[in-house]
Swiss-Prot record:
It comes from the Bacteria. HAMAP family: UPF0398. InterPro entries: YspA. Pfam families: YpsA. This is UPF0398 protein M6_Spy1399.
Length: 171
């Protein structure tokens, strides 16, 4: 079994507030290309954390690819209460994350800040690599996860950056 964690910017972090935003189409094209590359190299599990934005779009693409490839999808939420306060539209997305092949949560609820570090360490230990939509020009809390990932020998990181997206949109 080979599992890849998929994570990245949440929609509000990159100023996308509408699913019909033309940038979503370009991002999904890049996702499709990269996920197919993973599948053709033996990856059989895609793991998500259940966030809106990049993960949501990647989940949609992964579900489409299930028709062509033998793949499994898992969601490991940080907390059991993840998304409970989201609006109705976002609850529909949350239900898609809960309708995958494997669903778990790491903690029942928030108790202390160290839970985040423990969660990321768990994800790193249970996956062989990560596909991350992230650019150092637009930092978020993902920088802590990426630092841990880069410190792990043999952990494979594939970054989708704004430069890669610009190249794709021009071709």
């Amino acid at each position: 079994m080979t599992a890849i964690l998929i994570t990245g910017y949440r929609s509000f972090e990159i100023g996308i507030f509408d699913h019909k935003d033309p940038r979503v189409s370009i991002i999904k094209q890049a996702i499709r290309k990269d996920l197919i590359g993973y599948l053709e190299n033996g990856v059989d599990w895609f793991i998500f954390t259940g966030n809106l934005g990049f993960e949501q779009w990647a989940l949609e693409v992964a579900n489409e690819l299930k028709e062509e490839y033998p793949l499994q999808i898992g969601t490991i939420f940080l907390f059991e209460t993840h998304g409970d306060r989201w609006n109705e539209k976002n609850q529909e997305v949350l239900s898609q994350f809960r309708a995958v092949d494997f669903v778990k949560y790491y903690f029942p609820n928030y108790e202390q800040p160290t839970q985040f570090s423990q969660y990321y360490q768990f994800l790193l230990e249970k996956t062989e690599g990560a596909y991350v939509f992230y650019d150092t020009e637009n930092e978020t809390n993902l920088k802590y996860f990426l630092k841990k990932a880069k410190d792990m020998p043999h952990y494979q990181l594939l970054l989708l950056t704004f430069d890669r997206l610009n190249d794709m949109s021009q071709s």
